[in-house]
Amino acid sequence: ASINYRYLSIETPLPTSHHDARRALQFMRSKAKEWNLDKSRVAAFGGSAGAQICMWLAYSDDMAKPKSKDPIERESTRLTCVATTGGQTTNQTEFWKEMITDLMGPKIEAEGFVRPLGHLVDPEKVRMATWGAKTLEQANKKAARHSALSLISKDDPPIFMSYGMPPTAKPPADKGRARGWLIHHVNLGIALKKKTDALKLEAHLKYPGAELKYPSQVEFFVDKLSD
């Protein structure tokens, strides 16, 4: 199944899209009998922002509300496994600043890659509006609560991550292309792989030149979801 979620805007700040995805997952589980689904074997896949949302679902504790009057909210949000492409494993400003400096050089300011949001152009105001926060501190706390690197724990499911460049790739000269290159960079996956290895969790990181057990997320899903 595929889902739609509301995109980021001033009217629908994060984590609106995350909550839409959570609701969709619980809705599908609520239809398990009608649709002949095995609700004990559920995986998620997404790219870029969708990848970020999938990791949030995978690494969050179960958000089911067993006593809710809404039967959909009673359903589990836990996943059997997850696969991502070009996923942002963190929303933490300091991580991004450090990564951009490492990849682009000390003369390039991370703030220069911040896109306007609605009528807002100032990076700090954009960040607060992105998370529906009144202060940067509030925004940063919300960001941490929706970042895979902050959430992951030893009881979380396997992941298969894909990125389009090797760690040694050089950044594009064009700034517009460089932004897309940065926000989907393999270093984001490497950071999460270090965390999964430390927690002894199963994680597969695909990029050009990497040697892997699974050629793609398809084989990964088949293995994890089959009897």
Task: Report each predicted region and the residues it spans.
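Catalytic nucleophile-loop/oxyanion-hole region of alpha/beta-hydrolase
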Residues: 2-39, 185, 212
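Solvent-exposed loop/turn segments at secondary-structure junctions
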Residues: 6-10, 48-52, 88-91, 166-169, ...
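Short, solvent-exposed loop/turn and secondary-structure capping segments
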Residues: 14, 56-57, 93-98, 171-174, ...
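Extracytoplasmic/secreted proteins, especially bacterial periplasmic and envelope-associated proteins
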Residues: 16, 20-23, 27, 52, ...
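Primarily recognizes the serine-hydrolase "nucleophile elbow" in alpha/beta-hydrolase
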Residues: 23-104
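Mobile cap/lid helix-loop segments that gate and shape the active-site cleft of serine hydrolases
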Residues: 61-63, 93-153, 157, 181-184, ...
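Short, proline-enriched alpha-helix->beta-strand connector loops that line the catalytic pocket
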Residues: 75-80, 153-159, 199-201
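C-terminal catalytic histidine-bearing segment of alpha/beta-hydrolase fold enzymes
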Residues: 159-169, 173-227
